[in-house]
């Protein structure tokens, strides 16, 4: 089976639609990338996992649409201030584009999301009951703060941190994540509260170290970005409970990120 690829622009998103060479009214999938600015192939260090998956699916009779993230590669828009809700809107536009194509079976359109893309898939499928299926690859099923706490623990222990040391650190990390759950405060107010929490145990000498303070400020700025705040507060499990379509969730046993 061959395949036919075509470039298109959906609102401000640039992407590629691959179609099987023979037949019509194909089932189709929209592929959604993970966190960070990703191109349509989700390219990293020379690897193009979305290209590989799209190629395999198309050769097996499934049409695939994948796009560069907003503000990335050939897509327009701003990535830095976008949240997963914004990316869900982009994904909805991709689904609607597929429905407009005569080659696609509009009743058999699903979403494949990788990492944070799995979260986005759940958001879209909850809003749109006609989504045929969802595949979550290394996605999340719990609220962001719980996920991040477990992730930090697994990564720290994989690097040799004794459990006793981790148990000593855990309350401080959990408290900082709890600060981010305060939806009645502005990002600037959260930054001040986080800064006070992080620096309360630092010595006067450490507080005078410009490099240390700059690193802390950069980390706090990242933690209070629109995307991170939405991620930490959102519980995909609540949306997952409401889905009526089939869901396939795949997670690697050794994947600790």
Please report, for each region that a protein language model flagged, where it lies by residue.
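Accessory cap/linker subdomain of secreted extracellular hydrolases
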Residues: 137-241
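Single conserved hydrophobic/aromatic residue that forms the stacking wall/gate
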Residues: 1-5, 10
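Conserved alpha/beta-hydrolase
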Residues: 52-74
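Alpha/beta-hydrolase active-site loop
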Residues: 81-102
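Alpha/beta-hydrolase fold nucleophile elbow
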Residues: 103-115
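Short beta-strand/loop motif that positions the catalytic acidic residue
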Residues: 243, 249-251
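Short beta-strand element of the alpha/beta-hydrolase
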Residues: 25-35
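The serine-hydrolase catalytic nucleophile loop
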Residues: 39-52, 69
